[in-house]
UniProtKB/Swiss-Prot annotation:
Protein name, per record: ATP phosphoribosyltransferase
Gene: hisG
CDD domains: PBP2_HisGL3 (cd13593)
Keyword Metal-binding among UniProt keywords: yes
UniProt EC number: 2.4.2.17
Associated pathway: Amino-acid biosynthesis; L-histidine biosynthesis; L-histidine from 5-phospho-alpha-D-ribose 1-diphosphate: step 1/9
Primary enzyme class: transferase
Function description: Catalyzes the condensation of ATP and 5-phosphoribose 1-diphosphate to form N'-(5'-phosphoribosyl)-ATP (PR-ATP). Has a crucial role in the pathway because the rate of histidine biosynthesis seems to be controlled primarily by regulation of HisG enzymatic activity.
Keyword entries, A-Z: Amino-acid biosynthesis, ATP-binding, Cytoplasm, Glycosyltransferase, Histidine biosynthesis, Magnesium, Metal-binding, Nucleotide-binding, Transferase
Organism: Chlorobaculum tepidum (strain ATCC 49652 / DSM 12025 / NBRC 103806 / TLS) (Chlorobium tepidum)
């Protein structure tokens, strides 16, 4: 029977949507999104979710429309959202690393540092962040809000831009050069202050944060199990670059032990043959969805 307690969750629509839903699935929360729907279904009666742009998430969470939500640190700063920052979740639309807001100019531009922006015109989606950055560097320049396609604006429509990038490939494709990093940002789980003060909601949010972080920790990791003769144990263990000391368990045959270890997936193709040569048997690999520290 339902206890009628529900946590209202805001999920980012747009570039972060697919990677966020995949992360939640690995954490054990399976959302289903119908075409053109902003209301995903979820296999948890205690959750209600709505898809909304990350740029607006902080404001709606601070107002109490959502109890919790996921958005970038950049948008929390840009909108001056009064929220509880629960957890750093370092992932983005295409990778498991932070994004950067960078100052960029045409490759042929004489601008070399932020100081060279004095009296210039800058286009960006993060007007407040850019104005603060200029003020901190003692630079007077005009800042215009950009509704999109910011990379195409220099040099005709702007002298420089402040734009978000993961790899820099889009900037290079538009013949732009990065001058400086303005801000590094990653996704954050945030909470409404009143919701955070509610014991049930806080526990629900904290549990979610733990599982999401565990899913991030497990990215690129696999588990290995194997049996090993005690006589070869030192040799086998010395060749395992494990995240932690391997777990060793006795077997019915007193001359053998079972080993279990978590390693980077990248090394498995070279590690398994070496383990076999060192004397390990019955080696098998398994996927890890969550790794809780």
């Amino acid at each position: 029977m339902s206890n009628n307690k529900v946590l209202k969750l805001g999920l980012p629509k747009g570039s972060l949507q697919d990677s966020t839903l995949e992360l939640f699935a690995n954490a054990g929360f399976h959302f289903s999104v119908q075409s053109r729907s902003y209301f995903p279904s979820i296999d948890d009666d205690e959750l209600e979710a709505i898809l909304i742009r990350a740029q607006e998430m902080g404001r709606y969470v601070s107002l109490g429309a959502f109890d919790a939500g996921l958005t970038g640190k950049d948008w929390i700063i840009e909108t001056d959202a009064d929220v509880v920052e629960v957890a750093d979740l370092v992932y983005s639309k295409a990778s498991m690393r932070p994004v950067r807001w960078v100052l960029a100019v045409p490759e042929s531009s004489p601008i070399k540092t932020v100081k060279d922006l004095e009296g210039k015109h800058i286009a960006t989606e993060v007007v407040n962040i850019t104005k603060k950055y200029l003020a901190e560097n003692g630079v007077n320049a005009s800042v215009e809000f950009s509704w999109g396609a910011t990379e195409v604006k220099p040099p005709e429509l702007a002298d420089a831009i402040v734009e978000v990038t993961e790899t820099g490939s889009s900037l290079r494709a538009n013949k732009l050069r990065i001058v400086e990093t303005v801000l590094q940002s990653n996704t954050q789980l945030i909470a409404n202050k009143a919701a955070w003060a509610d014991p049930w909601k806080r526990k629900k949010i904290e549990n979610m944060a733990m599982l999401l972080q565990g899913a991030i920790n497990a990215q690129g990791k696999v588990g290995l199990k194997m049996n090993a003769p005690k006589a070869a144990l030192d040799k086998i263990m010395s060749g395992i670059p494990a995240l932690r000391q391997p777990t060793v368990s006795d077997l019915a045959d007193k001359e053998w032990v079972a080993l279990e270890v978590i390693v980077s997936e990248k090394i498995v193709r070279t590690l398994i043959p070496e383990l076999k040569r060192a004397g390990a048997e019955g080696i098998f690999e398994y996927n890890i969805n969550k790794l809780i520290d």
